[in-house]
Amino acid sequence: MEFFNILQSSCNDVNLDFNDKKYNQFISYKNLIQEWNKKVNLTAIVEDEEIIKKHFIDCIKIFKASPIGEAKSLIDIGTGAGFPGIPIKILREDIKITLLDSLQKRINFLNIVIGDLKLKDIQCLHGRAEDYAQEAEHRQKYDVAVSRAVANLAVLSEFCIPFVKKGGYFIAMKGPSVEEEITVATKSIEVLGGKIEDIIKIDIEDTDLKHNLVIIKKVKETEKKYPRKPGIIKKDPLK
């Protein structure tokens, strides 16, 4: 019951209900990660306790950002093994979620997870954020965009902010040192229609992990020319 108690304690910390069903979904998810990681590079974190703490607990902490608890629709960009989108869905069955990733093998894995965990109102998209953000079905259609992907904030913002409707939020899950990234990215966030509203510091219990949630509110619509063409965003981030 150790893992149940760890997960329950983390959920209590963000005022979320936790029960046997959710626990079993998390354990099934963990087992699938370990099984699939032998053939698909999903994560370098493979031990039971590390997956629970460094992936699942880290994702639960995103509920410290109030928009996660209020949103009706969410897109997780560069979701990888499903972080944080799958944990959010386990804990909030009522939210409609889209998982976006550029690697088909990871999408195959995520579809297996969705089926095995019997998750509803969740879809996977294979492709680039730059392309989907220009499609009417996805552009400025989501209450919240989230990303735990490894990229600097200026680059992530151009990938993610165009998906968010005016009045919605982009929440970036960043490492312990974000001050310099924020300084560099502030102008690009503004150009894309966003404004930094808050930075929430996160500590993961019983680990050395310290993270930051950068909360960006969409205050105006994104100009049609953004995001720019694939490849340009990383080569020439907005300044």
From Swiss-Prot:
HAMAP family referenced in this protein's UniProt entry, alphabetically: 16SrRNA_methyltr_G
CDD domains tied to this protein: AdoMet_MTases (cd02440)
Localization annotation: Cytoplasm
InterPro entries noted in UniProt: rRNA_ssu_MeTfrase_G (IPR003682), SAM-dependent_MTases_sf (IPR029063)
Protein name, as recorded: Ribosomal RNA small subunit methyltransferase G
Entry function: Specifically methylates the N7 position of a guanine in 16S rRNA.
EC nos: 2.1.1.-
Single GO term (MF): rRNA (guanine-N7-)-methyltransferase activity
Residues that bind S-adenosyl-L-methionine: G78, F83, A129, E130, R148
One GO location term (cellular component): cytosol
Group of enzyme by EC: transferase
Superkingdom to which the source organism belongs: Bacteria
Keywords linked to the UniProt accession: Cytoplasm, Methyltransferase, rRNA processing, S-adenosyl-L-methionine, Transferase
Location, primary (coarse class): cytoplasm
Family of this protein: Belongs to the methyltransferase superfamily. RNA methyltransferase RsmG family.
